[in-house]
Structure formats: structure tokens, C-alpha cells
């Protein structure tokens, strides 16, 4: 993992350059393979592109996101889920700036199918009582994901008697496929669940109680998602920073976009993001308040609105 991280950071060095009005106008996003963060990144990319910025986005793991922000090889990450990323955020807090909360009302914790919940598994402490039915496994996401690290912490410290359990490292699509199959067979499965996500519509599921400060937070997985940037970004990009501070999403809006992606596999996240933006142009007034084009001369709102007419 360490070697892989170093290789990615070296690659990022060729992408970064500091920019202000009148110079190169390149903005670099970093994101992870979570549908919601991907959609938000595509929307931000589209708008900034119309304003005259050259915009790129690199897909990596959560730890690499923070390392790249620290080394100033990328600029922006729209996926700082809190409190689950608290540990890595604290590690890098002197090298990043929290610009805004781009979504509240989110959830991130362990989940089970509704039939399992109704059979008595409603709390983390209920899991081990039914260890055999779960095959002592919890299905997680990609390596390096903070949710995985929380589950490992629970297992390694025997929280909720989970010392004999196994974390199954996977990916969002693979985990969802596994959960879908097991639900179709009425099997018992515990997995990382979150909202917004179309899994909440795909599956009749329930979130477990029992989360603590050391796990998914003290409010049973209730979360916020922040926009974070590298140090000095606000000073170098005041115009983009104003836009990012204004950029806010509702859980419902992300759920709707995710559901459309799920229903139509031919669509790419960019297609859905731009379509949704076209259908919700009223948000642009708020998002682009106080924002100019990249050269500092044009009306950002007018430019983006005009783009939907072409």
C-alpha cells in the first residue's frame, strides 16, 4: 500500500500548478469510487469548465486523496465524510482546509436487510448472537476506506464481541452485487450502508444502532459531507472557493441521480449530473452568487445558463 501510494503521489506532481486570474486556470479534483461523490464532482467540473477553467479529476483511494492534498498535487475533495474520516482528517488537518459542508443529513454505518432487522438484529451487539447465520462476515468497501478501518477496529478490539468476525474487502459495485444476491436468497448479511445511495431504494434494509464515538459516531451513523481543499487554495483561487462554499446538495437530490444511474446502465455519471443540473437550474442562482468567469470579467450565472441553450 505504501509503495502504491508513493507511485500515485509522484504521478500527481505533473498535474499541479498554482493559478490565479490571468494565469493558467487549471483546477484538479480528487475523488473516490463512491457514486455520490462522483456525481458531485461531475457537477462541479461541468460548471467550472463552462466558466473557463481547465478541470481534471483523479480517481484514487481515500488515503491517497489526503496525501495528494497535503503535497498540493490536487486541489479539491468533495467527499470528506464525517465523523467516519475523523482520524485521517486529524492526521492531515494542518495541510488541508475545510471550506464548507456540501451535504448534511447523511448516514454511514452498518446495515442489514429488513427481514434480519425484524428477526432481532437491531444493534451492533446483536450481530455476534447470530454469528453463524452471518457466517461471521461483514461486507465492506475498497482497501483504505475509512468504513473498513472502523470495522477492523471493532474486530481487533473485540467491540460488540466481534473478535472472531471477518471484514470482506470489496468495492461499492461488488458489495452491492453480493448483498443483492444474498437478499434474493433470504440469507443474512451485514454490510456498510450509507445514505444518500440508491441501495436504500434497491433494498428493503435497516441501519443498526450502537455506533460510538470510536466507530461510526455517537449519533448512530448520522454524518455530514465536507468540501476540503489544499492549503493556500483559497488565496490562489478566491473565485473557485466562493463557488465551492456555495455548492450544497440535499440527500434527496443525490438519491435521485443515483437511482437514475442504477436504472439505466448505459448512462455515465457525467450524463446524469448534467441532466439533473439542467432540470434544477434554479440552484445555479445560489451556487454562483458572487462568482465570475475564470478571467474575472464575465457573469458566471449567465454563462452557465446559456450553456443549456446550446
Which ranges hold each PLM region?
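C-terminal functional modules
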Residues: 247-310
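Ligand-binding cleft/hinge of the Venus flytrap
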Residues: 44-51, 131-165, 278
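A conserved helix-loop-strand patch within extracytoplasmic ligand-binding domains
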Residues: 95-147
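Ligand-binding pocket segment of bilobal, Venus flytrap-like solute-binding proteins
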Residues: 74-78, 149-213
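A bilobed periplasmic-binding-protein/Venus flytrap-type ligand-binding module shared by bacterial periplasmic
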Residues: 108-118, 222-236, 259-260
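Pocket-flanking alpha-helical
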Residues: 41, 60-95, 178, 198-204
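Short helix-initiation/N-cap motifs at beta->coil->alpha
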Residues: 32-35, 53-68, 166-178
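Short, well-ordered beta-strand elements
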Residues: 23-36, 53-58, 135-139, 244
Amino acid at each position: 500500500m505504501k509503495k502504491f501510494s508513493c507511485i500515485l503521489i509522484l504521478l500527481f506532481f505533473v498535474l499541479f500548478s498554482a493559478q490565479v486570474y490571468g494565469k493558467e486556470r487549471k483546477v484538479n479534483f480528487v475523488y473516490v469510487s463512491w457514486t455520490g461523490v462522483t456525481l458531485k464532482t461531475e457537477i462541479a467540473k461541468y460548471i467550472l469548465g463552462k466558466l473557463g477553467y481547465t478541470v481534471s479529476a483523479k480517481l484514487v483511494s481515500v488515503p491517497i486523496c489526503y496525501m495528494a492534498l497535503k503535497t498540493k498535487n490536487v486541489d479539491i475533495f468533495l467527499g470528506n465524510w464525517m465523523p467516519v474520516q475523523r482520524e485521517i482528517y486529524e492526521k492531515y488537518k494542518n495541510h488541508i482546509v475545510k471550506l464548507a459542508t456540501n451535504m448534511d443529513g447523511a448516514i454511514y454505518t452498518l446495515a442489514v436487510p429488513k427481514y434480519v432487522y425484524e428477526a432481532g438484529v437491531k444493534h451492533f451487539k446483536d450481530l455476534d448472537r447470530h454469528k453463524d447465520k452471518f457466517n461471521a462476515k461483514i461486507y465492506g468497501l475498497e482497501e483504505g476506506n475509512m468504513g473498513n478501518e472502523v470495522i477492523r477496529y471493532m474486530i481487533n478490539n473485540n467491540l460488540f464481541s466481534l473478535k472472531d468476525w471477518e471484514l470482506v474487502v470489496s468495492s461499492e459495485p461488488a458489495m452491492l452485487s453480493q448483498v443483492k444476491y444474498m437478499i434474493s436468497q433470504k440469507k443474512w448479511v451485514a454490510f456498510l450502508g450509507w445514505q444518500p445511495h440508491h441501495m436504500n431504494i434497491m433494498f428493503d434494509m435497516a441501519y443498526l444502532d450502537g455506533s460510538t464515538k470510536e466507530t461510526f459516531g455517537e449519533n448512530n451513523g448520522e454524518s455530514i459531507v465536507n468540501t476540503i481543499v489544499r492549503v493556500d487554495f483559497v488565496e490562489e483561487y478566491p473565485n473557485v472557493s466562493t463557488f465551492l462554499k456555495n455548492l450544497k446538495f440535499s440527500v434527496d437530490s443525490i438519491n435521485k441521480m443515483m437511482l437514475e444511474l442504477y436504472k439505466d446502465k448505459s448512462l455515465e455519471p457525467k450524463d446524469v449530473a448534467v441532466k439533473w443540473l439542467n432540470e434544477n437550474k434554479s440552484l445555479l442562482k445560489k451556487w454562483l452568487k458572487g462568482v465570475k468567469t475564470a478571467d474575472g470579467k464575465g457573469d458566471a450565472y449567465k454563462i452557465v445558463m446559456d450553456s443549456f441553450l446550446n
